[in-house]
């Protein structure tokens, strides 16, 4: 028996209600799927911080410094190393570093981390690796396809990531770096790693440069490179291979290693030959 309510067939009412629910559910699922797809696309887009064109990469770090190039001379308690600066590629980070060096900020700061022969971290006024204030710690990260984490590269450390609500949901954000810096030595390039690097790199020249010169490929396009060591590589190697005490995120040297000073100048072949700064 059919029940008639207000002159309408209740069976038909139930069928229409079910159909409506199915349509609503389908619409919700469609919107959800679209949101997931868009979210994945946005994540991919936002995580691709820089577009690399293998045809136009210039591996400038493999070139010797030229007369008049800006340089930094880092005098440590273990010796001195020198690197050429790249203001044309990382203008804001180089300006921040240069300003701090010229002000004497780096005088008697600490090498506060030494990572198993791979790299060292320097430039902290405190033994625990912290900075005294944030006034020079919010420089937007600058990436460039011509700068890579080869052995001897100097990179400024990432300090923070700022994200909007949308970026927290879908990925992306703005990375910042500051005063402290890494000086890279190298990871080990065994045969398997060399093969993997050659197969995964879009640029044959870049892969071969890492294999020949060393470096830390997994840091590629992850932090701002400001310079490339051209003198004192033995000091770079020592700084990366210190005996350490593990304490939280840092491996502190067992014995204090000090950055006595960082001097900004210009490259002169004559000065290099005579040992002048």
Question: Could you say what each language-model-derived stretch is?
Answer:
Residues 3-277:
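Cyclophilin-like peptidyl-prolyl cis-trans isomerases
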């Amino acid at each position: 028996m059919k029940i008639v309510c207000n002159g309408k067939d209740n069976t038909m009412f139930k069928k229409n209600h079910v159909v409506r629910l199915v349509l609503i559910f389908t619409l919700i699922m469609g919107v959800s799927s679209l949101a997931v797809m868009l979210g994945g696309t946005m994540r991919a887009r936002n995580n691709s911080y820089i577009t690399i064109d293998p045809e136009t990469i210039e591996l400038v770090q493999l070139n010797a410094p030229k007369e008049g190039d800006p340089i930094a001379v880092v005098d440590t308690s273990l010796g001195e190393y020198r690197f050429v600066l790249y203001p044309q590629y990382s203008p804001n980070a180089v300006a921040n570093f240069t300003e701090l060096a010229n002000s004497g900020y780096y005088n008697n700061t600490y090498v506060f981390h030494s990572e198993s022969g791979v790299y060292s971290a320097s430039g902290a006024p405190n033994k625990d690796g912290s900075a005294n204030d944030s006034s020079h710690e919010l420089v937007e990260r600058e990436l460039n396809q011509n700068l890579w984490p080869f052995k001897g590269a100097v990179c400024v450390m990432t300090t923070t990531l700022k994200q909007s609500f949308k970026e927290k949901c879908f990925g992306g954000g703005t990375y910042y770096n500051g005063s402290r810096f890494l000086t890279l030595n190298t990871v080990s390039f065994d045969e398997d790693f060399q093969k993997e690097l050659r197969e995964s790199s879009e640029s044959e020249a870049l892969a071969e440069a890492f294999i020949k010169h060393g470096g830390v490929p997994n840091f590629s396009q992850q932090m701002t490179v400001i310079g490339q060591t051209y003198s004192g590589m033995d000091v770079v190697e020592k700084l990366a291979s210190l005996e350490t005490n593990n304490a939280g995120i840092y491996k502190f040297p067992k014995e204090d290693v000090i950055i006595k000073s960082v001097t900004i100048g210009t490259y002169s072949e004559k000065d290099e030959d005579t040992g002048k700064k």
